[in-house]
């Protein structure tokens, strides 16, 4: 059939272009908006009508049914012809009348219009999807008679790029890149060389630090089931044995922010003490999560209480064990001196449950002090109003401010349960004076004497439970009547505790040239009388003292300390010395042992 400047008798939809369709020029298959295939026999009539309406060629012209003349009448108005000058082998958007067939059926014409509209709609949707996927077909051009998909307004940038994008910057995905602070915790964090970086100092005592962004994580994804490690008033601890981590979850937001702030300061001090002075014994924060209120620390084999109970069941300790114990506590004493004097940090909660050890056959290889929930800033601190900028992986940087309570002494935290405090603090509690009435930051020398005395009490507890009591017929306890007072600190219990110390310590503390530099190491009865103000309190103390002389005199007189424990007990007597000057100097901590 001739195709010069006229259409065929069967109207075809025109896509425009050259003699071949643009999709025939592509390397891929020909384009079909409805994904039509070869018509089946059962749908021959419908396929024929669709081919006539969409302009497709008849596959079997001999099977086509001719239209009757009386079915369609001639059109009174000639249809407008699209002058596109392109081939009609593809899809089209208009129906044109020809001179061979001047009479067209209105039903076919209406069907063609509907099909053309459907075609334009489908192709427009397909084009938008291709544009979103970034699929650029070679040789593709705008098609005549189609409604092009809406385009965003483009203006050339100063780099000559019409996509309003900077060509010199890498193109990011629509989801963005997760920053370091927003990643989950999937493995053991690497050992940090720096935790805090000073940024600026706005005012005195108000420095601003930038926290290492690698320390923050979004959630825990370690891939193992944790074990319960313990719980307290400020949170609970879970142990991940495979990765060697201990994750503490705070019970409240205020407790978490306080402990996190002091843990950041303590961790930075720990790194500097180890690098410059070779002082260890301070637990170092490894990672934390603000949304989860969690802090990550290295896990240890046991705390000091569990270590002492296991040691008591293993028999008399060897010389290697006692030497490792002494060496570990000398390191802890140096760490507390460094924290109180150089860093301005007072722990206030030194006890066996907060000291963690790694050991092999009870020979301690590593020992640190942890649980910084009660730590306070003393008068030597220069960061009482410090701020910490934390990158959590979000758009805005979070700012953590050190709470004011972190630098304000609370006497209830200082006195605690009364088990590990020196006589000066207990006397202030009994008399309701001194530290009980003090406000503001605690003095650094007072904080140091409190921490060192508590460290000596923890060492004494370990020796009594794990070393001395197994060798005696009747075990000796460090505190005899604490549970009689329902685990609550009262004036009567404080007087009872002082009377028990005056009865027990003369039987334990050695009197050597090292321990008697500043006088007798244990508390004297006369000194306790002088420290107690009220006459009725003195009478109560005298009554408790007479009772212990009647009930515990023979037991304490039967104590025989093996010579292997003399060096460790010297350290105990210095840490728990009645004279505060002996605790502040601690010659054993800084003098190399022969």
UniProtKB/Swiss-Prot annotation:
Autophosphorylated. ATP binds at residues 229-237, 248. PROSITE patterns: PROTEIN_KINASE_DOM, PROTEIN_KINASE_ST. It is found in: Virion tegument; Host nucleus. The active site is at 349 (proton acceptor). Gene3D superfamilies: Transferase(Phosphotransferase) domain 1 (1.10.510.10). GO terms for molecular function: ATP binding; protein serine kinase activity; protein serine/threonine kinase activity. It catalyses: L-seryl-[protein] + ATP = O-phospho-L-seryl-[protein] + ADP + H(+); L-threonyl-[protein] + ATP = O-phospho-L-threonyl-[protein] + ADP + H(+). Its main location: virion. The lineage of its organism: Viruses, Duplodnaviria, Heunggongvirae, Peploviricota, Herviviricetes. It comes from Equine herpesvirus 1 (strain Ab4p). Belongs to the protein kinase superfamily. Ser/Thr protein kinase family. Displays a substrate specificity similar to host CDC2. This is Serine/threonine-protein kinase UL13 homolog. Multifunctional serine/threonine kinase that plays a role in several processes including egress of virus particles from the nucleus, modulation of the actin cytoskeleton and regulation of viral and cellular gene expression. Regulates the nuclear localization of viral envelopment factors UL34 and UL31 homologs, by phosphorylating the US3 kinase homolog, indicating a role in nuclear egress. Disrupts host nuclear lamins, including LMNA and LMNB1. Phosphorylates the viral Fc receptor composed of glycoproteins E (gE) and I (gI). Residues 38-47 have a biased composition (Basic residues). Residues 223-594 form the Protein kinase domain. GO terms for cellular component: host cell nucleus; viral tegument. Its EC number is 2.7.11.1. Keywords: ATP-binding, Host nucleus, Kinase, Nucleotide-binding, Serine/threonine-protein kinase, Transferase, Virion, Virion tegument. Residues 1-105, 128-183 are annotated as: Disordered.
């Amino acid at each position: 059939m001739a195709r010069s400047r006229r259409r065929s008798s069967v109207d075809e939809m025109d896509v425009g272009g050259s003699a071949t369709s643009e999709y025939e020029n592509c390397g891929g298959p020909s384009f079909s908006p409805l994904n039509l295939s070869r018509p089946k026999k059962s749908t021959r009539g419908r396929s024929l009508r669709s081919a006539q309406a969409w302009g497709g060629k008849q596959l079997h012209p001999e099977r086509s049914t001719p239209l009757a003349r009386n079915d369609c009448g001639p059109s009174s108005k000639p249809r407008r012809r699209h002058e596109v000058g392109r081939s009609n082998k593809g899809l089209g958007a208009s129906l044109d009348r020809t001179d061979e067939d001047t009479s067209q059926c209105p039903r076919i014409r209406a069907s063609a219009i509907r099909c053309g509209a459907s075609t334009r709609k489908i192709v427009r949707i397909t084009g938008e999807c291709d544009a979103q996927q970034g699929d650029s077909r070679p040789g593709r051009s705008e098609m005549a008679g189609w409604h092009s998909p809406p385009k965003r307004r483009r203006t050339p940038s100063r780099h000559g790029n019409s996509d309003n994008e900077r060509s010199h910057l890498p193109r990011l995905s629509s989801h963005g890149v997760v920053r370091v602070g927003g990643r989950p915790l999937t493995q053991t964090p690497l050992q940090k060389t720096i935790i805090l970086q000073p940024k600026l100092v706005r005012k005195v005592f108000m420095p601003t630090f930038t926290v290492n962004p690698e320390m923050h994580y979004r959630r825990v994804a370690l891939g193992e089931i944790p074990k319960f490690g313990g719980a307290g008033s400020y949170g609970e601890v879970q142990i991940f044995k495979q990765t060697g981590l201990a994750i503490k979850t705070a019970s409240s937001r205020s407790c978490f922010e306080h402990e996190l702030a002091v843990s950041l300061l303590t961790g930075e001090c720990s790194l500097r003490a180890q690098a410059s002075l070779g002082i260890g014994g301070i637990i170092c924060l490894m990672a934390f999560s603000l949304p989860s209120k969690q802090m990550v620390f290295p896990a240890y084999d046991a705390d000091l209480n569990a270590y002492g109970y296991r040691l008591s069941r293993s028999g008399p300790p060897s010389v290697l064990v006692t030497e490792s114990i002494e060496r570990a506590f000398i390191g802890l004493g140096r760490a507390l001196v460094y924290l109180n004097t150089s860093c301005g940090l007072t722990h206030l909660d030194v006890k066996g449950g907060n000291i963690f050890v790694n050991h092999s056959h009870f020979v301690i290889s590593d020992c640190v002090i942890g649980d910084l929930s009660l730590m306070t800033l003393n008068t030597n601190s220069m960061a009482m109003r410090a701020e910490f900028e934390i990158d959590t992986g979000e758009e805005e940087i979070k700012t953590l401010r050190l709470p004011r309570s972190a630098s304000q002494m609370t006497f209830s935290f200082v006195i605690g349960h009364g088990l590990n405090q020196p006589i000066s603090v207990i006397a202030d509690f009994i008399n309701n004076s001194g530290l009980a009435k003090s406000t503001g930051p605690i003095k650094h020398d007072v904080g140091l004497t409190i921490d060192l005395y508590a460290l000596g009490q923890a060492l004494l507890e370990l020796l009594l439970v794990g070393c001395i009591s197994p060798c005696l017929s009747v075990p000796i306890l460090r505190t005899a009547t604490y549970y009689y007072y329902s685990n609550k600190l009262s004036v009567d219990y404080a007087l009872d505790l002082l009377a028990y110390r005056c009865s027990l310590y003369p039987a334990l503390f050695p009197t050597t040239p090292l321990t008697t530099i500043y006088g007798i190491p244990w508390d004297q009865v006369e000194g306790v009388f002088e420290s107690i103000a009220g006459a009725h309190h003195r009478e109560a103390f005298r009554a408790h003292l007479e009772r212990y002389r009647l009930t515990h005199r023979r037991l304490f007189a039967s104590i025989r300390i093996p010579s292997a424990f003399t060096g460790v007990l010297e350290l105990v007597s210095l840490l728990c010395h009645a004279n505060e000057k002996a605790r502040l100097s601690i010659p054993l901590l800084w003098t190399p042992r022969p």
